[in-house]
Structure formats: structure tokens, C-alpha cells
Amino acid sequence: MKRVCLFMTLICMMMVSFKPDGSDGHEGHGYVDLGLSVKWATCTVGASKPEDYGNYYAWGETTTKSSYTESNSKTYGKKMGDIAGNSSYDAATANWGGSWRMPTKAEMQELIDKCTWTWTTQNGVNGYNVKGPNGNGIFLPAAGCRGGSSLDSAGSGGDYWSSTPCDYGRDYYAYGLYFGSDGQGMGDYYRCYGLSVRPVVE
């Protein structure tokens, strides 16, 4: 009987500790080690599952709103530095706490350059399976973006903020990751737009 109990205990311990996708957690939110310089969250801020769209945030803002315009943007036209980890401006830090933060432009570029991107559908949601150099992966849903009160490109494109403002004197833009079924890259967005935020942790 003791052997049976010991065997069952070992099985339970293995089931709890075995994470086939390389996932782990911090402050109640899961992350995946892709073999990059930072670990990427399994979900977007405001989402409970990887395929959920989650919330949309204007750059440098930590709460959602019904309309995303130049007039109600807190950072549009304002000279800013990188906001990573600043809870007054970083939606990941403000909403998730701990060491969570928005990824920098360089970290997003690393995600593009060092990972394999496969357009797919997960539980009926279009997006990319992004597989890191170590074989682990995350799913980024094509959640679109918000301008004014409209949601654009949901299901066909994804737009994710970096923490980095544009570096060529334009105080109205910040860098973000964009993708569609035909590819992905980095671009500049008006800060007033509502984009997704996928946190990272070191």
C-alpha cells in the first residue's frame, strides 16, 4: 500500500512540474522561455487565454477607454523616453505588477529575427504561432487596433506596442510590432491609437 501511495505521489509531482511548452509564471501570469533575452507572456494584457484579444491601450497609458483620439491621448506630442517598467506609463507594469513590463523595440525585433512565425488559427482565432530558437512558442492573436471608437483589422492583422518612442524627433509616434498573414515587421504608430500589449519579464 505504501508503495502504491508513493508511486501515485511521484506521478502527481511529475504532472505538476512537467511543462511541455516551456511555460512558467510570475505574479499570477504565465510566460514562455523562447530562448531569447527576455521571457514572453502567454497572454496579452486583459486576456485570460492566449487567443483572447485582451485590452487595447494608447501608448503611455495604463487604462482602456471607449475612444482613442489625439485629443484624449496623454502622451501625443509629448517628448518621452523609453517607458519600460514605469508604472505611470507602462500598461504591463501597471496592470500586472512585479517585474512585468512592455517589450522594447530591440526585444520585439529580436522576436521577429530569431523566431519562426507561422500563420495559423487557434480555437477559431487567427494569429501567429511564434516559435523560439529553443523550440518553445507563444501565440499572438490578430487582434487589430483601435482608432477612434472603431476596431480595425481584427482577425487579419495584429498591432502590439513596444515601450520605445520614435527616435527621430517625432513626438507623436512610438514603435510597434505589426503583422498580417503575409508577414511581420516593426513600424511607427500614432501614440493615440489603441494597440495590444504583450508583456515580457527578465
Language-model segments: which ranges?
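Bacterial Sec-dependent N-terminal signal peptides
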Residues: 1-24
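C-terminal, surface-exposed recognition/capping segments
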Residues: 24-202
